Amino acid sequence: MAKNRKLPNPEDLLFWIRYQMFFFWKKVKRIHIVRKFRKFIYNFFIFLDDLLLSSVRKVRKFSFFLIFKYKYFIINLEDFLKFIKEIFDTSVLIVSVGTRFFHESESQEKDSELIFNFIPEIINSDGLMGTKVLLESKKILYENENKEKDLKLIVHFIPDIINNNVLIGVKVLLEKKKIFYENENIKDLEFIEGSELEGQEIKSEDIEEKVVDKDYDDSEGRVLLDESDSQAYFCREIRTREFWKQKYGNRFYYLNGHGIGGNICANDFVEFKDIKDIKKRKKYDSNKNDILVGVRDLLREHLKEKKMNLKLSGDKRIEEYDPNFNFDNPDLISSFNSTSTSTSTSTSSSNDLNLDSDSDDSDSDDSDSDSDSDSDSEIDYLDFNFDDSQLDEEGREIKKKMMIKSLRLYRDFALQSMYGADFFMMETESDDDSDSDIDEFEKVKNKYKLTFDISKEIEKDNISDFDYFLLDLFLYGPLNFKVTDICDIDQMYRVQRRERYEKMFETYKHISSIFAFSINFIFIPSDRFISKDSLQGEFIFDEFHSMGNELKVLILYW
């Protein structure tokens, strides 16, 4: 542990105990006797952690504090139980504040109706902030005299809020309510939503006339707004994408057609730095006002510019870009990633506490590339359907070990580059790896013409190269690669250390594509940085220094 690392806030004794517990596990897990009974100790730690976490929830000032996602948790409210199956099926995280929320209300019947009406919709969209949105919805519903009008407002906006701006959903809802009730004209509601109302499309020119004039930094597409002016602040969130693109560029991410926030898949994951990029690809859907260029499409175009062709799952190479090519073909998906289905339908399996590094499934997510050289055109043919059966048993074992080592090296390199070597508890070696494995792997790689090794690319300082980012995402990221609750990009820019946020976001985005795990980004008003790495089973607890006053901590759920 670095000397300058501070312990968690001493007044929070339970959290400090929890911190020490996992730090102790990190120190002793390689002892022989511990390794021998690792499974038992692992389960015992989970049990202790669950008890501690239950206590932590009770003492924290904010009610939605939950560190890790479990397959099980205790809820005293019987009426809540019927939602458990749906909650687990959608692999979301919800905080058990339902009892307090339900029983503290003067009208349990009305509260129950509110819960039943909104929880399925909130959970199905993005549940990480579902509880708080629900609590604030209740507050809005019962603090206003016009309950019917408020209820209509909540019903109208919650799906849009959850899908697009889940992290600030409550604030958006509150501000929309404020604007909604302070203006009699129904067009104000139309303006707030910024899209369509009763089938009437809002034109960007109309919105532009209503936007409060503020300072904008067009050079990087960043919008600098005064949060005190709620109307201008939330116009930034809800103005149409077309208007945004025309006036402010594209320094933000399109995620699954929702803009900032929501869910993303590999074929929907791309940043456009310039509007010309979008027009060039001609994949614009005017009905949705969103860009539908997928990362696989972008990858193929990018490689084509580099004079590289792809050979996909035994299919003939497609010399020209074919917009109708079905990249979502089930056979194609299974050939890339045998675990893609389990990753998307049961995210909890990849996000569960995994202290046992022996349970890595890296080999199931590995894809290898085989290259042939052409002396004339120097075209690399990447066979994404490389079959491990071409390797002998020894070769497969070495390949598996080296892939795990490479991924760990990649992770540590990225973290070190962001925060310095002394900021994280670095640990790259696995239980059975040795330096001799590297030489053995080189022999196997040369024998079977395996062309990739992430650790070698790191040595070449290619970690941030756009080529490798696309290739890594294509090779190692499951087709169902999912990111939920990405912190609002512009909100990150408003904090004191906006460059650090941006770099952190980019790096973890890259890491998550390599690790092929679901990763959730969420900001909460706390004072600690917590990371759970399912691949290696390491828990890293640390304070996140100098993050500014507005947002102090990033919690990553791996």
Swiss-Prot record:
InterPro entries: DUF613
One GO cellular component term: plastid
Keywords linked to the UniProt accession: Plastid
Region (Disordered): 338-380
Transmembrane segments: none
Composition bias type Acidic residues, residue spans: 355-380
Compartments (UniProt record): Plastid
A Pfam family: DUF613
Comp. bias intervals (Low complexity): 338-354
Protein name: Uncharacterized 66.5 kDa protein in trnI-trnV intergenic region
Source organism of the structure: Euglena longa (Euglenophycean alga)
